[in-house]
Amino acid sequence: MTTDVIQWLLESREPWTRYRTLLDLLDRPDDDPQVQTARAEMLAHPQVQTLVSEAAAWPGYALKRHNDAKHPIHKFSTLADFGAYATDPGLPAAIEAVLAHRSPEGALQTLVNIHQRYGGTGEGMWTWMLCDTPTLLYALLSFGLDDDECVRRAANHLASTIDENGWRCVVAPGLGKFRGPGRKADPCPIVNVYALKALSLSPDLADSPATRTGVEMLLGHWKDQKERKHYLFGIGTDFRKLKYPFVWYDILHVADVLGRFSFVHTDPRFREMVATITAQADEDGRYTAASMYRAWKGWSFADKKQPSPWLTFLALRIQRRCGMG
């Protein structure tokens, strides 16, 4: 990690990048004047204020596919990635809207539209699946709500849904026989990513049998990428492309989540994954998106022609966590 690239991040016009760089790469305390200034500028930034407004309009519209990058659920997770707090302007109302819909099991619910050909009604209904509820849980935990009783119950419920080979496609009991594609006994790679990301923020569950099983599922998938492909989730050229926000199953998302667990840092499978990312840096140590979500056009991480400060920060943080930077 060179001084030049760090300075480039600190001179970025992205206050969220400056804020996280100071905290995560330079270990500045929260009360550091530069940290506080960057944070204030982040919250005042028009793009961030738009994210907050879209989150506050929860549920926005019924979710039909979980890789819909423009859905408000991914505005929540991006605000969490940036470092928003539950008390930040606009977020209390958004959080209240999320907590207003919880299942009897404790899971946070999303307004979902399941097509009739998949056993749904074709209309919006409040329910949960393991490919949406962990993302909401991640956001609320990141916002600092780990002591909230509803949030703790949601975390415990998520941990309880683990199976012997990782998290599988599990949905609310009210959805009957509905489940996602693939073999019933197979783990779902993206569910394991979402679940691990959420539970990494739970003081009681971050290092638990559930998280260790989920981590092994993802590392095993990387190791066996040529021998086995989980339905919809191959590890090929597209998987290796740097992409943000963290919506779907790709290398930066997976490595960022795995890197949250210290017991992974020396695993050769993880380090090989990180090396695949670092090989994509340019001569100045900067990273450029190789793929993008059109719904996020206008953000640096959705520009395939110019290096992105935020993508560069994410890559450097992964390296720093495991001592490879």
Residue ranges and their predicted role:
Residues M1-G325:
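Preference for long, amphipathic alpha-helical scaffolds in soluble/luminal domains
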